[in-house]
Amino acid sequence: MSMLVVVTENVPPRLRGRLAIWLLEVRAGVYVGDVSAKIREMIWEQIAGLAEEGNVVMAWATNTETGFEFQTFGLNRRTPVDLDGLRLVSFLPV
């Protein structure tokens, strides 16, 4: 089990309700919980299927250099980039 954080923007209410089944919504669109890898993958499938035009970032604790991993869904000005094996975030100007 590992700590999981999901941040959503402009997603349908049905996805927010679905996330609230497994995670605690601590602020509007911000969900946290302690889940297994299998549940994390299942949550991501729900996000990919229900997010529509919204965007989502999901981050979880891992045994890596940074101590976490993340993935994104949908259009966003922040895009993940790989720099020599280190995942960073590039901010695109308007």
Curated annotation (Swiss-Prot):
GO terms for molecular function: DNA binding; endonuclease activity. It holds the Pfam family Cas_Cas2CT1978. GO terms for biological process: CRISPR-cas system; defense response to virus; maintenance of CRISPR repeat elements. Disruption phenotype: Loss of plasmid silencing. The keyword Hydrolase applies. It is an enzyme of class 3 (hydrolase). Changing R16E: Dramatically decreased spacer acquisition in vivo. Keywords: Antiviral defense, DNA-binding, Endonuclease, Hydrolase, Nuclease. This is CRISPR-associated endoribonuclease Cas2.
